[in-house]
């Protein structure tokens, strides 16, 4: 029987000794099974006892590997996703973070669950990303991708900003607020949820717009189609420099008068889960929802 995965990559920037140990355990276990294994280049100075030729950059890992094993929390997964979504590679997570909505495997007993995946017993789903572009005087000045959300916000100093929102070039509304969260279904359990946004099933082709502290009592989150293009026109009267934050990890500077174009990326993240994975079980356990009554 042909293996579904032959070349594996271990990704993640560990924050503590336990996470470092998890990286080592996964590496040696996979090598004992006969797999070709590459490791995130950021670990080169930490895992000094491993062969240097087995380290590679994220882009190289995306080109070489069939399956990426991301060790850490959702932050590590988000950082990897923005790069790996450009390549034909599947991704699974081992949770060494906090909530871990995107990282299914427990580091204490990863071997059995990961073995099932390597044997071909798994679920795969695709998660779409957003592209965020900053347009100035008709030119794209900067851009990046986001798996969770792209957020327009005031930058380092909190203050109200003014902007207009267009959906497919149709004017939707203007707003004075602390900013706007534009979220994917994947991101609907992240920053968007904290801002009062709805939880969306990951299979939905939809985007949410969640205002941040709007200066009005009538403003509510808005859900639009996933294929619609969102344009935010920043008022030239705003003071200072604003920012668009992608997944809370990459910041794009925004000047008064700029346009922010946000749309669904052509790239998707191929996310692998154990065969018994249930999104609603994840919601119950991570968000502390009540169990069944009968």
Swiss-Prot record:
One Pfam family per UniProt:
NAD_kinase
Protein residues bound to NAD(+) = 74-75, 148-149, 159, 176, 178, 189-194, 249
Question: Which keywords appear in this protein's UniProt record, sorted alphabetically?
Answer: ATP-binding, Cytoplasm, Kinase, NAD, NADP, Nucleotide-binding, Transferase
Reactions catalysed, semicolon-separated, are:
NAD(+) + ATP = ADP + NADP(+) + H(+)
Q: What is its EC number?
A: 2.7.1.23
Please give the biological process terms from Gene Ontology that the record holds: NAD metabolic process; NADP biosynthetic process
Q: Where in the cell is it found?
A: Cytoplasm
Return the GO cellular component terms, semicolon-separated: cytoplasm
Cofactor(s) essential for the protein: a divalent metal cation
Read off the SUPFAM superfamilies from this record: NAD kinase/diacylglycerol kinase-like
The active-site annotation reads 74
Q: What molecular functions are annotated in GO for this chain?
A: ATP binding; metal ion binding; NAD binding; NAD+ kinase activity
Family that this chain belongs to: Belongs to the NAD kinase family.
Reported function: Involved in the regulation of the intracellular balance of NAD and NADP, and is a key enzyme in the biosynthesis of NADP. Catalyzes specifically the phosphorylation on 2'-hydroxyl of the adenosine moiety of NAD to yield NADP.
Q: Which HAMAP family match?
A: NAD_kinase
Q: Which NCBIfam families match?
A: PRK01231.1, PRK03378.1
- The protein in question is named NAD kinase
Highest classification ranks of the organism: Bacteria, Pseudomonadati, Pseudomonadota, Gammaproteobacteria, Vibrionales
């Amino acid at each position: 029987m042909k293996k579904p995965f032959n070349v594996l990559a271990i990704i993640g920037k560990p924050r503590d000794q336990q996470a470092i140990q998890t990286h080592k355990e996964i590496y040696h276990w996979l090598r004992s099974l006969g797999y070709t294994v590459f490791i995130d280049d950021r670990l080169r100075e930490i895992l000094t006892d491993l062969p240097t030729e087995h380290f590679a950059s994220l882009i190289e890992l995306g080109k070489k590997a069939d399956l990426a094993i991301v060790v850490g929390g959702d932050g590590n997964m988000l950082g990897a996703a923005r790069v790996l979504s450009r390549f034909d590679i599947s991704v699974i997570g081992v949770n060494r973070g906090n909530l871990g909505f995107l990282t299914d495997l427990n580091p204490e007993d990863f071997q059995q669950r990961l073995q099932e995946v390597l044997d071909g017993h798994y679920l795969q789903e695709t998660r779409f990303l957003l592209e965020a572009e900053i347009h100035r005087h008709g030119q794209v000045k900067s851009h990046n991708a986001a798996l969770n959300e792209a957020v327009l916000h005031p930058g380092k100093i909190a203050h109200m900003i003014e902007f207009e929102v267009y959906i497919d070039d149709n004017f939707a509304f203007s707003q004075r607020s602390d900013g706007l969260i534009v979220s994917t279904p994947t991101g609907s359990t992240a920053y968007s949820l904290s801002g009062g946004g709805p939880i969306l099933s990951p299979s939905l082709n939809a985007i949410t717009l969640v205002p941040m502290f709007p200066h009005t009592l009538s403003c509510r989150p808005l859900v639009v189609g996933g294929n619609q293009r969102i344009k935010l026109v920043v008022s030239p009267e705003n003071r200072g420099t604003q920012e668009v934050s992608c997944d809370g990890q990459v910041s794009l500077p925004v000047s008064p008068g700029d346009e922010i174009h946000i749309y669904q990326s052509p790239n998707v993240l191929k996310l692998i889960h154990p065969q018994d994975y249930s999104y609603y079980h994840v919601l119950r356990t991570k968000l502390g929802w009540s169990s069944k009554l009968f």
